[in-house]
Every structure is written in structure tokens, then in C-alpha cells.
Amino acid sequence: MAVTTVAQFAAELNRPAAALLEQLHSAGVAKASTDDALTEADKERLLDFLRSSHGTGSAERKKITLTKKSTTEIKQADASGKARTIQVEVRKKRTFIRRDDAPAAVEETTAAAPVIDEAELQKREEEASRQAELLRRQEEDLAEKRRAREAQEQAEREAAEARQRAAAEAAAAALEAAAAEPVVPAKVEATGVKAAAPDTAPAVAAPAEPPKPALRVVKAADIEAEEKQKAADLAKRRKAAEDEASAIRAMMNAPKKVLVAKKPEEPKPAEGIKGTIHKPTAKPGAPAAAGAAGAAKPGDKKSVKSEKLSSSWADDAAKKRAALRGGARPDAGGRGGWKAPRGGRRGGDRGDSPSTFTAPAEAQVYEVHVPETISVADLAHKMSVKASEVIKQLMKLGQMVTINQQLDQETAMILVEEMGHKAFTAKLDDPDAFLEDDVEVTDVPLEPRAPVVTVMGHVDHGKTSLLDYIRTTRVAAGEAGGITQHIGAYHVETPRGMITFLDTPGHEAFTAMRARGAKATDLVILVVAADDGVMPQTKEAIHHAKAAEVPLIVAINKIDKPGTNLERVRSELIAEQVVPEDFGGDSPFVQVSAKTGQGIDELLEQVLLQAEVLELQAQVAAPAKGLVIEAQLDKGRGPVATVLVQSGTLKRGDVVLAGSTYGRVRAMLDENGKPATEAGPSIPVEIQGLTEVPQAGDEFMVLSDERRAREIATFRSGKYRDVKLSKQQAAKLENMFETMGQGEVQTLPLIIKADVQGSQEALGASLLKLSTAEVKVQIVHAAVGGISESDVNLAIASKAVIIGFNVRADAGARKLAEGNNVDLRYYNIIYDAVDEIKSAMTGMLAPEQKEELIGTAEIRTVFVASKIGTVAGSMVTSGIVRRNARFRLLRENVVVYSGEIESVRRMKDDVREVKEGFECGIKLKNYNDIKEGDQLEVFEIKEVARTL
């Protein structure tokens, strides 16, 4: 720590060092020279000396006032019963006074006095002795006054005792005299006592009277007594304030009391009167009950039998009298005076006085059974809360919902637990639960059935042509574009037995159809073209067959074409885990030609051989079960479904349940369009009579009761609808913030109408795959059947393009579409529809901007024109320099500025462009910082159409 000398301190104070040294000597700080060190204590002593010499002294506060204010809120019901918040403000003010005793003050003053010289010291000593003498005299006076006061108090006590003794003696004498003369002498004795008392008291008190003290001592005693009284009053007020503050704190911190009404005790019957309804007579010595509870007034017409039973009877007379005087009515709920309502009986049953307290109801915990889907309103009703509370809680959980929105079971159960209730998975009253037991027939014997074979492979590999040769028909020629777009089901009678074939599409769009075909089949024939080998849909067919765990027979087709490489096909199939039997695998390879018929018999033999190994059996004399292969809406026949019977026998007139649809079989056709009365296992047929178009891939079964079928179908449709809505809403909410972040996204709304369910499903899936981050395909509606006016109206509202796949619009729909400029597109080949939609989406993409360099120029000189500004005299080194083109200014191969060329001049003429090898003057727009040697790159921005 730095040491401060006297000279340095004087420099800080801007005073001469000699004057500071003299002041230090006066303050009692012994410093010989200006080089001596000063401590903090020396500076404090100097400061105290200067303050006392200037008369300021220590500026200590003798009185401190503290003010404290606290605000609290209490809730209290007003006259109308509503809770009101009242603000309570508590203010506390305390004053602290510092009291110094006179002797201590004198000692401090004496100690703090500086030593100046001997004469002054002598004078101060004399003053101190005088002060001490004065204090001694004051103490003696106070002691003398205290002794006089004590003597006076002693004399008063003795006089009081003497008076009490005299009074006691007089009372004793009066009692003795009263025994002989009871009336008259008593007055005389009393008078004697009164007369004797004044004589006795002065006799006793006279000797105790002390001599009067001096006036000075009396004044000092009065001052001391007054100070003591003030101190006592101050202490009393302080204690009262502290008690009040502590009481308020205790009241605010105390827990709120819940008033619980006591259950009234039933009066116990008196002993000896049990079993009787008569009022017992009061005993003669017993006091009256009315006297114990307060005598009843003559005006009271009813007496209170028991205070515990009722307290209202006692008030009846008072209420009636108040009503007669115009006061409160007896039926006004106990309210009288200004609290009673003015007008008639209306409002007389409102709440009582604000002092009425209702105990809060205890929270009720409910057991909520949550189904698979439930609306917000229904869930709120089950928990006995308002729907708004449920919506608030869902918002806290991050779900934006409406009152009619469907919630899935998991979300609803989490919400119920969050709101303090118990959630249970509801046991649904599901009609499907016992459906299998109703339909199952166990006492019917199993019989052999024909195998169901699915033909799969890549597009144009000859699947349908292979079936054509087997069926000796020309089915492939009838398909649009020569490709299969429907799943076909045929059964063929061969010399070796019956076989049912399912022909699936090979186009990539029909993945779901191929999966359904693999699900319904017993065997899979994988057709591979010898010239193409394994293709993407070939690999997919292999995966479907393995997923369905069905045997695979490979038919290598088109072996009659020149240039085929069978070994390459084998190696590619082995790479896909399809190993031929020749190499130790389990898949027979057959070389066939659908054109010449080569290998067809061998292929059928392999199919029947595999079927014998599988030992395929099914019940015949039982209700039919099977699979919906394809479904469509026919204009004349209504909903039509192609079904494959897997077990039992389907007859005309049976009640069929297929997914969420049902109906009675009105007509049944085979694959050739001929009517049929029944169909056994492994037979595909076309049925009519369903209420709606079923979903392809749904299972169907025959029920004995149409009412039960309708009930199950209705339940399934409602359940599917609720689940679909909940999933749609969840998808919307999840994608909402993503869509907001992406900005504006182009959408292409479409309405798809197809001839069959499978084609509509495949077309919709293919078009949805075309969606990109900038252009999205939105399928507004997709259904089976012709294009109707309702479809056109939906397209008008949603600004959608209508796509008809193998269907057409009726006359009314065409007229409405022409009048409202609705785009109608018809297709019969699926990849034509996909290509056109893809080109339409390409046109909706924003064009891509690319820079094209058109020329360069070198700045040779820089000159300033008065009206134009800074002009760059340049030489065009390559390409052309064009007016209004964009440029980049390079200085030492570093881009300095990028902008636009304002004008180009050649020989004082304003020109549009200057070619290579010519000099020109270039004026740059809004830029003048150019130097000799800079390079200009001139370019144009061109828009290039983008493709998907």
C-alpha cells in the first residue's frame, strides 16, 4: 500500500505544507517535517479537529424514522354473493431517538478537546471541575429528592394501614352493637365511623410529613419523572404496534378454514317414555323448559320443543311481526332491511348474505373408457368438464383441435391422465368379435381343390400372351396399349385337372395389385423375357412371392427370339436368391414360348406337380369365404366385384359381407360373362348386388342374416371413417409448420375417376409419387365410375383437373365442364396419364436463371464529362458489350462491383452494342470508382425451363 507524506497530502489539498503541519500540531498529531508519513488515523484526527473548530461537530443523526408499507389482497363475497378482491394496505412507522446521558457527553467533549497551551489547559481544567461540582450537586439534590419521595410514600402507606385498621375495628364494634339493637344503632355506628376516621388519619399521618425540599431538587425530580413517563409511553406504543403487526401477519399466513356444517344430533328420548307417542307430563319439581331457554313471550304462538331439531320455529313470530311492520318477508331467505329485494317475490330466492360460505367441492376422479377414436366433445362429457378445458389442455400438449375433431385412442388416454382421471381401453361392442365363431363350420369334410396360380413379371414380358395360349383366347389384344391394367382371374380345364390363373399387371404402378395377387395365390409363375432378363418389376414380384411364402416357378419366355442369352438370365435370377432345381434350389425353371407354344405343357405339369405336393384342400358344403380381386361401378349394373372363392360354395341369393359393404348376390357371372348359379373353391366369379363398391383386397364371407351383415358393415364404415379423419387431421397439423416454413408451394389438384378400384388406386399412387418440394399433386377425390355433374362441381370449387381412366363423362357433366372451363382428360393407358401430369407439373415449376457471358472489355482510360459523369474508355477484347447488360468489374482479378451498363458510346454516338476489337465509352450505372487496367465482364441472365 502506498504511503502518503505530509507534503503529498498538502499537494492533494492545494494548501501550503507549513500550514498543514501547523494544523496537524493543533490537532495533536506530532509531525516534525513535511517528509513524515501520514496514516489514516492521523487524517481522521485532523478531520475531527477541523470539524470541531468550525462548529460543525459530528453530524450524527439523533432521530431516525422508518416507514414500511405492505399491500395484500383478501377475497370476500359482497351482498350479491359475488367474490370481490379487497386490497389491504398496512403502513408501519417507527421512530428511533438516540439519547445520550449528560455525564457521558461531558466526558466525550472533554476527551475530544484539543490541547492548545497551558493557559487554555488550566482554563479547561477549571471548567471541568466546575462541571463536576455541578453534577455532584445535582446528584445530591436528586438523591435528597428521592429520599423525601420515599419517606412520603412510606408515610402514605402507614396512614392507609391505620385507616384500614380503624375501619375494621369500627366494623367489628358495629356488628356487636347490631346484635343488641339491630336498626337504630347501626346508623349511629356508621356515623361514628365516618367521624372517627378523619380524626384518626391525621393523627397517624401527621408525624410522617417531611420538610419541603428545595425548588431546584423538585424541578429535577419532575424532569426525571416526565422522562420516565415518556419512555414508558413510547415503549407501550411500540409494543402495541408490534402486537398489531404480528396479529396481521398471523392472520394473512394462517391457512384458510373450511367450514363444515355439523350434522344435527337427533334428540334422545327421555327414559321411561319409549314406545309411546304421547307427550310426557313434567315432573312437579322439574323447572320449566321455557324458563331454562328464556320465557316465551305471550305473542309467540309456537314454542320451541328442541333447539337441536330446529331453530326456525322460534323466529316465526318475529318474522311475522317484521312483515306486518313492512320489514323483510319471512320467505326472503333470512335477509332483512336494505338487503331484501324491493320488488315482489321475484329474486327472493337469491343468495344469502355475503357471510355465507360454501365449502369447495372435492375433485371427482372418473374412470374414462376410451374407444379407438373419440371426439373432443364426447371425451369432455365423459370427464364432466367443459370442452374448452379439454381443448386448452390439448393445446398445452401441442395439439390444435376443434370441438368435433376425432382423437385417436393413445392421445385421448394421455389427455385423460393429464387431467387427473383414470383412463381405460374401452371394450368395444364390436360385431366383428364373434364373427369367426358364427361363420366357422367344423363338421364339414375337406375336399381337394384346384390350385390358384398368379402370373407375375415385368411389363411386356409376355404374361398375358402366355395365358392366351393356355386359354386359346386373345385377351392381350383387347388390353389398351397391349399391357394389362386389370387383375384378371380365369380358371382353365386341362386334361390334367383344373387350374385357376390370376393375371397381374406388370407396370410399376400396380404394386398393390401384385401384392393382392400374391396374397390370394397358392403358386406364382414368374415370367422373365429371355432377351430382357431380370427387370425392376421382376425383382418386386420375387419379393412379393417370398413375402407370401408361396412356391415359385420360373417361366423363361420368348426363347424363340434370336440372340437370347439363357445363362445371363439364370445368373441374374440366382443373384436374386431364385436358384433353379438343377443347381440344388427349389424353383423349377421352364423355357417357354407364348408365340409357338413351346414348353407350355411342361409348365402346366410343373404347376400340377407343385399343387399335389401342397395337398390343397377346402370345405365345399359350407358358407363361402374368399377375397375381392377387383371391384368397379358399372353404369347399368351398379357395384360389381370380382371375387375368388377360397372355401365353401357361393350361391346366388346369399348375403355377402365384404369389408364395409354388404348385399345379397343378385347375379353371378363367370370370367366369360356367362351366368352361374354357384361357385366352389378356387373359382373366380363376378357378383352384383352390393350396396357400395368394396375395396380391392377385402375379404368376403357369406352370413345367414342380412340384418347382422348390415350392422357389421355400418360399424366398420363408421370406424374406418373416424380413423381416417383422425389420421388426416394429424397429418395436417404435423405438416402445418413445415408448409409455413417452405413458403408458397404450387399444388396441382386432381379428381380421378376410374373403371375399377385397382386402377384408381394404382393411378393415384403413381401421380402422388410425382410430387416435389415445389409442386405437389393433391388428389381431391378418387372414386370408381363415370364422371358425373357432382364431380364437375367439385372440380369447379377446387379448381381441379378431372382425369377419367377408361370412363367418360355423361352429357350433363360435359356441358357443365364446357361452361365453366373445367379441364377433362381421358386416358386408357396409365403411363400416358402419368406422362401428361408430369409435363403439366413441369410447366408449373419456376424457371431456372443462368448467367451467359457475352463479352469482356478492358478499361484503357478514364475521363470525366461534365453532364455525364465518369466514363470508362474501353477496348472490347471479346464478344460484345451491350447497353443495359449486366457487368462485373474486376480489379486485379478480384470482383469489385456488379451492376448494369447505363450507356455505350462510339465516336460520340449513343449505340446499342459494340463488337470485339472496337473502342467505346462505357458509362456504368451508379458507380464511378473505376481505374485504368480494370476489366469488365458483360453477361446476361437467361431463364431456363426446369424439368422434374
From Swiss-Prot:
GO terms for cellular component: cytosol. GO terms for molecular function: GTP binding; GTPase activity; guanosine tetraphosphate binding; translation initiation factor activity. Residues 503-506 are annotated as: G3. Keywords: Cytoplasm, GTP-binding, Initiation factor, Nucleotide-binding, Protein biosynthesis. Residues 256-362 are annotated as: Disordered. PROSITE patterns: G_TR_2. This is Translation initiation factor IF-2. It comes from Methylibium petroleiphilum (strain ATCC BAA-1232 / LMG 22953 / PM1). The gene is infB.
